[in-house]
Amino acid sequence: MSAKKLFIQTLGCAMNVRDSEHMIAELTQKENYALTEDIKEADLILINTCSVREKPVHKLFSEVGGFEKVKKEGAKIGVCGCTASHLGNEIFKRAPYVDFVLGARNISKITQAIKTPKFMGVDIDYDESEFAFADFRNSIYKSYINISIGCDKHCTYCIVPHTRGDEISIPFNIIYKEAQKAIEKGAKEIFLLGQNVNNYGKRFRNEHKKMDFSDLLEELSTIEGLERIRFTSPHPLHMDDKFLEVFANNPKVCKSMHMPLQSGSSEILKAMKRGYTKEWYLNRALKLRELCPNVSISTDIIVAFPGESEKDFEETVDVLEKVRFEQIFSFKYSKRPLTKAATMPNQIDEEIASRRLSTLQNRHSEILDKIVKKQENKTFKVLFEELRAGNSIAGRTDNNFLVQVEGSEELLGQFKEVKITNAKRMVLYGEIV
């Protein structure tokens, strides 16, 4: 019997990418589906959604409306992920042609969902921490691995605890076996995922080997054949000295750290319920620079959070100047349902929010230009992962710079030393030495 065709579109974060991989694995290995990039030939169309900001939620309904217009007769449409978790039945009301809704904590029910009319699985208490997922990887050379699910922080702007539930650590033996399996299949790098990865080990569903995130990094680095370990996202509150020292000293841990700032104002951080101050953040970031001079630090920043004054915003710019981030992901505050910040007084005018975002991004561009210029004539070890146009190939350095050289498919999955000859903001161009 010929395979049915599966089309999947993934929006949002790396955790969504891994969730999509899990669903693809379940469907291709257990339900006789094969992936297709042509939506018109698909028997099953999935969209894995994000709800961190308002824009992706609006995009969901425009996308599924487009799916309905082009899908073939009899094809099913499923809405999955975080937006599915918090909108639930509203999706059926606004898009009655959707066949099932599957929240982020319920992806293991995908085979049940495709067989049940108007199936809705949005229980954020459903436990997938020990679910034995079938295996699928979008990349041969890099493997995403969940080490925890959910979040307990309840930051006042964030909807994630309402869509992914409370935080539970995945047992070490499951993580270790998944990493081993990925390496055996050709992966050179594993990418550990969680809402707060460095809070790992605080709570398991059942009794398991006790360890913290630093211990986990050390244990995983013993896997033979594993070259690199990356992770996202750590929480600044849990960046103790032990964690920073393991990060700096373990040669398999990539020297790229994502440190979500959100705001440089201690008052705004308190209103956000982030649990740390500007001083704590700077202490940790500068300690990291001291321990690991070649580290690349990225961050998330929200401007125009309710009540943010010009002085508060200037505090954020001050942190930007002091830490000199290699990369920032910056956004205007987006009001999200079910969050405390949505009903806070002193919501910021859109014009002010846009101006602050522009100011922040322009200042970072100036900083970044100086950072990338310093990379010229340096030599980096690069893992090549992606073919580019014009007989070029791209990969990443240990500290996460994107590097492009002339090269062919035979370099995919290989490490090569590259000397940088021309550094741009988004790409470092170089030559293999």
UniProtKB/Swiss-Prot annotation:
Record GO cellular component, one term: cytosol
TRAM domain ranges (all copies): 373-433
A Pfam family the protein falls into: Radical_SAM
Broad class of where this protein is predominantly found: cytoplasm
Radical SAM core domain ranges (all copies): 137-370
Domain MTTase N-terminal: 4-119
Catalytic activity: N(6)-dimethylallyladenosine(37) in tRNA + (sulfur carrier)-SH + AH2 + 2 S-adenosyl-L-methionine = 2-methylsulfanyl-N(6)-dimethylallyladenosine(37) in tRNA + (sulfur carrier)-H + 5'-deoxyadenosine + L-methionine + A + S-adenosyl-L-homocysteine + 2 H(+)
Keyword tRNA-binding: no
Cofactor(s) it depends on: [4Fe-4S] cluster
Location within or outside the cell: Cytoplasm
Note on how the cofactor is bound: Binds 2 [4Fe-4S] clusters. One cluster is coordinated with 3 cysteines and an exchangeable S-adenosyl-L-methionine.
Purpose: Catalyzes the methylthiolation of N6-(dimethylallyl)adenosine (i(6)A), leading to the formation of 2-methylthio-N6-(dimethylallyl)adenosine (ms(2)i(6)A) at position 37 in tRNAs that read codons beginning with uridine.
NCBIfam families named in the record: miaB-methiolase, MiaB/RimO family radical SAM methylthiotransferase
Subunit structure: Monomer.
This protein's name: tRNA-2-methylthio-N(6)-dimethylallyladenosine synthase
Source organism of the structure: Campylobacter jejuni subsp. jejuni serotype O:2 (strain ATCC 700819 / NCTC 11168)
